[in-house]
Structures are given as structure tokens and as C-alpha cells.
Amino acid sequence: MEQILKILKQMLSPDQAQILLKALKNSNNENFYNFALENIEIICEWLNSKEFQENYTNHPYPPLLNPNYIDTDASRHCAELAWDLNLPLPKHYKFIYISPHGVGAAAFLRYLNEACNVFCLASWMLPYDAKERYCINYMCLNDKNISDQAINISELNIINLEKYLALLDPHSKVICGIRDPIGILKHNWGRDWSKVQRNFQNEFDLTYDYRNYINFLNHKKP
């Protein structure tokens, strides 16, 4: 770390140095530390570049390398490095599908996957951690055996969701599933919930803390 700090002091302004230091602080990936040390001059050159200043100065998670000149593969190693380097997800997806609960998302995803040959993972089947979701999508998007893909977003209570959203292409096409409120209530009332895993007790009495149910029903930030 002392070697990195010495180089940063020589090559970057305090504000630019904080970009890399923040990324190092937020990571527990030893491979990322080693990568940053081995490529510190390339990272500094990019942070000093005109392209970075014009495009990423105000970005909440600016990339530490030029995302347009990165050679990657579908490995977990590359996916984790890309997350720590704040690299946007590869732009190989056709669109983003936003699906609030109760709008027929499962049926639409089946239509995409089976009828349209567009591979799209159901977000509610993925871990509730944005890094894991990013890595899974990153590996899929770099898999040459999968041609057409889309990304599904359905939940808000995901760890590090803000970073995940910031690493999506802001110019992507978006399909948003909607439904009238009464229709959503009818759907949820008539649905078979027997196969749904719930994170709260299904038996309670007057001493039970009702806030557990309210917190489950409400979207919340982690």
C-alpha cells in the first residue's frame, strides 16, 4: 500500500487518487490489489486522460481502466476484477427488462427464453447481492455460446444495488412490465404461494412483532 500511495502522490491529484483508494478500500479481493499494483501506471494514465475527465468525472463509480480497450473472458476471475475496477457490464445485451412483482414476469421471461431465443435470467432466482448478480451477468455476456441476451431487474432490496445500476449502459433499451393496481392485487390473491420461500414465520400470535411483515412487504435499501 505504501508503494501505491507514493506513486499516486506523484502521478495524480488528490481527487483522482481518491477514486482508486476508494475502490481499494471497498474491495476484499487480493487479486484486485495485486492487479492495481502491477498496473498502477496504466490506471493513473487513464485517470489523467481527457476521455476520463470528459465522461466519468461525475460518475459515482468511474472505471479504473478504459472500458473500450479491455480484453476479457467469461471467467469468474475476470468478472470479480471487472466489478472492483468499476467496469460497465459488456454491452452485449439487447435490452433491460424491469419487472415489478405481479406483472407476469415469469411468463414473459419464459416467452423471451423459449419463443424469442433471448437468454434472460430471472433476477429473483439470483443472490441478493449485486456483486454476485454482476459477476453472473458478466460471465454470461462474455460467453460466446450465448448469442442474444437481456438483463432482468425485479428487486430493490439488493446489497450494493446502486453500484450495479451505475454499471449498466444508460443508453440501453428498456422494457418495463406494468399492471393496474387492482390487477396486481387479484394476481397476488389468487396465486399459489406454496413454492415461494418466505423469510418470515407463517404462524404468529398477538405478541409477534408485526414489523417483520411490514418490512418484508416494503421495498427497502440494504
What positions do the PLM features span?
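PAPS-dependent sulfotransferase catalytic core
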Residues: M1-N145
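Serine/threonine-rich low-complexity intrinsically disordered regions
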Residues: M1-E2, S13, N29, N39, ...
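Short, flexible helix-coil linker/hinge segments at the edges of structured domains or between repeats
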Residues: S123-P127, R133-A150, W193-I214
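PAPS-dependent sulfotransferase catalytic domain
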Residues: N157-P222
